[in-house]
Design a protein with these regions (language model features):
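Accessory carbohydrate-recognition regions in carbohydrate-active enzymes
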Residues: 22-321, 325
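Sec-dependent signal peptide recognition
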Residues: 2-9
Length: 326
C-alpha cells in the first residue's frame, strides 16, 4: 500500500515543528554562571545586563582594591550599593555610576569609603544571564536586578518598616573620582540628574532619569563641595528617599542612563521601560540572551563543559556595549 504524499508532508511538518520547539525550549541562560571570575583577580561582576547593553547593574562591595576592580569580590561579605556601570575583566577600576542602596531604619554606616552597607550571604544570592538577586541581611530586604540596553530595573521587597532608598553620586572607588553631580526632583516618583567623573577614562559624563513605582514620603539632599588641587570643581550629592513599607511590599526603581543629556535619559526610560513591570522586562532580557547564546549549540553530556562554554560566551557579549544615541 502506497502512503499518500500529503500524509508524508504532514508528518514532516510536525517533525519539523517538534524539532524547532525542542530547540526553543533550551534555556541557555541556565548554563551561565555570572559568579565565575569574581574571585581572585578575574575582575568580573555578577550583576544584570542585556546583550551588548550600556547598563551593567551590579552590586558593589564598597571597598577599593585590586581584587575589587569590578566593584565585587566573591570573598567579601558586604554590599554598599547597586550601581549602573561596571567594567569586566579589565584590570582597571572605574565607573560605578548611579549607585542606589535600600535600607530600613536605623541603617548601618561605616567610615568612607564603605559608607552605608549591609552584610549578605552567598546562600541568599543567585544570578543568571540578565538577572541578579541578593538578600540584605541587616535590613531583611530582598533585592532583584534586571536590565534592558539602556535601563536598569531594581525590585526591592521590604519588611514592614520605616525604609529609605539612598542614591549616592559621591561614592567613588579605585581609579574613579567624582568631579561633579546633580539630582533634581521632577515629581513624587521621578528624579533626574548626572554624575561627572574622572578615572581610567577621562571626563566621563553619565546622565540619568529614575522612576520609582511608589511615591516617596520625603526626600533629603546632602551636598558637599568637591575640592581638587585646592580648587572647588563641583558638588557631590547624596539623596535619601523615605518610604513606609508593609510586609512583602515591593518598590521598583527604574533608571535609564545616557551619555548625552538628562532629556536623552528620559527618552530612553520612556522607550525601554514605560511600565513598572519587573517580570516583563526580565522575561524580555532573558529571551534576548537565549537568542544570542543559542546561536551556538553545544552537544555534550558534561554539564560543567556547557557552563564553562556559555559563561565564556556570555562574558564576551557584555564587552560590546550598546552606544548611546540619546
Amino acid at each position: 500500500m502506497k502512503t499518500p504524499i500529503y500524509l508524508l508532508l504532514i508528518v514532516c511538518i510536525f517533525a519539523s515543528c517538534n524539532t524547532k520547539q525542542t530547540k526553543a525550549e533550551i534555556d541557555y541562560t541556565s548554563y551561565v554562571n555570572p559568579f565565575i571570575g569574581t574571585d581572585f583577580t578575574g575582575n568580573t561582576y555578577p550583576g544584570a545586563q542585556a546583550p551588548f547593553g550600556m547598563v551593567q547593574l551590579s552590586p558593589d562591595n564598597g571597598l577599593p582594591g585590586w581584587d575589587r576592580i569590578s566593584g565585587y569580590f566573591y570573598p567579601d561579605s558586604t554590599i554598599a550599593g547597586f550601581s549602573h556601570t561596571h567594567l569586566s575583566g579589565t584590570g582597571a577600576g572605574d565607573l560605578y555610576d548611579i549607585s542606589f542602596m535600600p535600607v530600613t531604619l536605623p541603617y548601618k554606616e561605616a567610615e568612607a569609603p564603605l559608607g552605608i552597607y549591609s552584610k549578605f550571604s552567598h546562600d541568599e544570592e543567585s544570578a543568571y544571564a540578565g538577572y541578579y538577586q541578593v538578600r540584605l541581611k541587616d535590613y531583611h530586604i530582598n533585592v532583584e536586578l534586571t536590565a534592558t540596553e539602556r535601563c536598569g530595573i531594581q525590585r526591592y521587597t521590604f519588611p514592614k518598616a520605616e525604609a529609605a532608598i539612598f542614591l549616592n553620586l559621591k561614592k567613588a572607588m579605585n581609579w574613579d573620582f567624582t568631579n561633579d553631580s546633580h539630582i533634581e526632583v521632577v515629581d513624587s516618583v521621578t528624579i533626574q540628574g548626572y554624575r561627572y567623573s574622572d578615572g581610567w577614562a577621562r571626563d566621563q559624563r553619565i546622565y540619568f532619569r529614575t522612576r520609582f513605582s511608589k511615591p516617596f514620603d520625603k526626600v533629603e539632599l546632602d551636598t558637599t563641595a568637591i575640592i581638587k588641587d585646592k580648587q572647588h570643581i563641583g558638588t557631590a550629592v547624596i539623596a535619601r528617599f523615605d518610604f513606609h513599607t508593609e510586609e512583602g511590599e515591593q518598590i521598583l526603581v527604574n533608571t535609564a542612563i545616557s551619555g548625552v543629556s538628562m532629556e536623552g535619559a528620559a527618552k530612553n526610560l520612556q522607550a525601554e521601560v514605560p511600565e513598572n513591570d519587573f517580570d516583563k522586562y526580565l522575561a524580555e532580557t532573558k529571551a534576548n540572551w537565549n537568542r544570542q547564546l543559542g546561536k551556538i549549540e553545544v552537544e555534550s553530556n558534561n554539564q560543567d563543559d556547557k557552563v564553562n562554554f556559555y559563561t565564556a560566551l556570555y562574558l564576551s557579549l557584555i564587552h560590546i556595549s550598546e552606544p548611546t544615541r540619546l
